Amino acid sequence: MERLFCVPCGYGTTDPLTYPGPWRHCQQQNWPQNMGAPIFLARLRVPANVSQSCMNPYNRAQLQAVSTQMDPNLSLWLRSVHTTEVGVQVSLRVDKSVQCSQGSQTLHSSSLSDRTSSRKPTEAWEVGRRALIRRPQDGEDEESQEELTGPTEASQLLLPTWSRDREEQFPRLKELGEEYAHSPQDRKGKQFLELKYGYFHCKDCKRRWESAYVWCISGTNKVYFKQLCNKCQKSFNPYRVEEIQCQTCLRVCCSCSPKKRHIDVRRPHRQELCGHCKDKKFSCSVFFSLK
């Protein structure tokens, strides 16, 4: 059982622990011959010119990552060659980038496929666990790149390209947003609605009838939407709503002990405000006078 284990970018080779033992000649001819021992039993052979190869930060980072997986003690020896610590970030959609003490840098792969492929540089944000690093474009000053670490700084990220194009097409969006901003002074002149449950009051005929939840102007008892009075059939806006309160504590939602009430069996809806006429053909006000 022998096979080769290739290290990416051609950094060194691996040999089995028994190399160059005599066990190769003892194998039978009919057995399938595999080149090399299992991966977890392989050991790394570092080339003699490793110091020259490590001068390239991209190659050094790859070698250090491979050597750490094979032998953790070997990474300490590699650090003595060059004192700059390098961390590699790999993304499937954007190029590899390295963040070191000198600043963020974009490193292109040395493979032939990446050299031949010509694509436009795309602006992207690489999100890490602790920082957001912006990939610099070609010809951009490295000193102008900043590392965003805090939530307040992360909120200052540039908008995507599609949103920039949209702002160019609609330049008035930002101005209109500022005009309709909800400031404390603007809220005073605007009306907000809230639900209330109480009695309707008609000012003309002085009639009152029970109502369900209606939309009232916030802070008042005025009904916002127009409704017709059952008696005078006048569309008066707004109606006034009197909240149904407890006679003892004068609260809408009270915790007083319930009292026995006289309930008319023929007209239970008058005593129980539970909406008996809901989803029915005729409402209760058609048959009964709720004055």
Swiss-Prot record:
Pfam family, one: Zn_ribbon_3CxxC
Predominant place of localization: cytoplasm
Disruption phenotype: No visible phenotype: mice are viable and females are fertile. Mice lacking Zar1 and Zar1l oocytes display delayed meiotic resumption and polar body-1 emission and a higher incidence of abnormal meiotic spindle formation and chromosome aneuploidy. The grown oocytes of Zar1 and Zar1l mutant mice contain decreased levels of many maternal mRNAs and display a reduced level of protein synthesis.
Expression across tissues: Expressed in oocytes and zygotes. Predominantly expressed in maturing oocytes before maternal-to-zygotic transition (MZT). Less abundant than Zar1.
Transmembrane segments: none
Subcellular location: Cytoplasm, Cytoplasmic ribonucleoprotein granule
3CxxC-type Zn finger ranges: 195-280
Gene Ontology CC annotations of this record: cytoplasm; cytoplasmic ribonucleoprotein granule; intracellular membraneless organelle
This protein's UniProt keywords: Cytoplasm, Developmental protein, Differentiation, Metal-binding, Oogenesis, RNA-binding, Zinc, Zinc-finger
Any one biological process term the GO annotation gives: oocyte maturation
Signal peptide residue numbers: none
Residue spans of biased composition, Low complexity class: 106-115
Annotated stretches, region: Disordered: 103-152
Biased composition (Basic and acidic residues): 116-129
GO molecular function: mRNA 3'-UTR binding; zinc ion binding
Assembly and oligomerization: Interacts with YBX2.
Domain notes: Disordered region at the N-terminus undergoes liquid-liquid phase separation (LLPS) for the formation of membraneless compartments that store maternal mRNAs in oocytes. The 3CxxC-type mediates binding to the 3'-UTR of mRNAs.
Function statement: mRNA-binding protein required for maternal mRNA storage, translation and degradation during oocyte maturation. Probably promotes formation of some phase-separated membraneless compartment that stores maternal mRNAs in oocytes: acts by undergoing liquid-liquid phase separation upon binding to maternal mRNAs. Binds to the 3'-UTR of maternal mRNAs, inhibiting their translation.
Family: Belongs to the ZAR1 family.
Name of protein: Protein ZAR1-like
Species whose genome carries this gene: Mus musculus (Mouse)
